[in-house]
Amino acid sequence: MASSTTNNPALDLDSDTPENPGHELAQFASGCFWGSELRFQRVVGVIKTEVGYSQGHVHDPNYRLVCSGTTNHSEVVRVQFDPQVCPYSDLLSVFWSRHDPTTLNRQGGDVGTQYRSGIYYYNEEQDCLAKKSKEAKQKEFKDKRVVTEILPAKRFYRAEEYHQQYLEKGGGNGNKQSAQKGCNDPIKCYG
């Protein structure tokens, strides 16, 4: 990671790079990161997923601190993908299908700023595609405003290990869910 360009490293742009130079990174916030991650794990062309925290103002946050509502972090899924196999527009389609983008700071029973809807881009092309997709989604919601924020991807803080691939590993009750590419089984979130 490059040295901080501000007095607060949490406010820096995410300067991590994909493991393969032909791959790209993307960050999405759409409520609890467990179900969101599993949905992205199933996408052909997604190489790796990690859950974590981004867009906040506290350096090196943890789950408990983020859930306190004092850090302004989003729960995010950072996706490493091969754009030759999975265009960014496909990831945007997965993002929009996974949550209600008209609810501010909540998804279902999960309430708090960490559950907000957000697309955090790494380059101008992602920014442009994200904005176009939001405009298209807004047309579907005639009477509701899409509240999804679209911002540059700030520093990514990887969540604690037990959150990584949580539903694939069985979640809180041991019922493993498939992360197989192309799987369309319903995603059941549980702690």
From Swiss-Prot:
It comes from Fragaria ananassa (Strawberry). Pfam families: PMSR. Residues 1-20, 168-191 are annotated as: Disordered. GO terms for cellular component: cytoplasm. GO terms for molecular function: L-methionine-(S)-S-oxide reductase activity; peptide-methionine (S)-S-oxide reductase activity. It is an enzyme of class 1 (oxidoreductase). Its EC number is 1.8.4.11. Belongs to the MsrA Met sulfoxide reductase family. This is Peptide methionine sulfoxide reductase. Has an important function as a repair enzyme for proteins that have been inactivated by oxidation. Catalyzes the reversible oxidation-reduction of methionine sulfoxide in proteins to methionine. One of its GO terms (biological process) is cellular response to oxidative stress. Signal peptide: none annotated. Keywords: Oxidoreductase. The keyword Oxidoreductase applies.
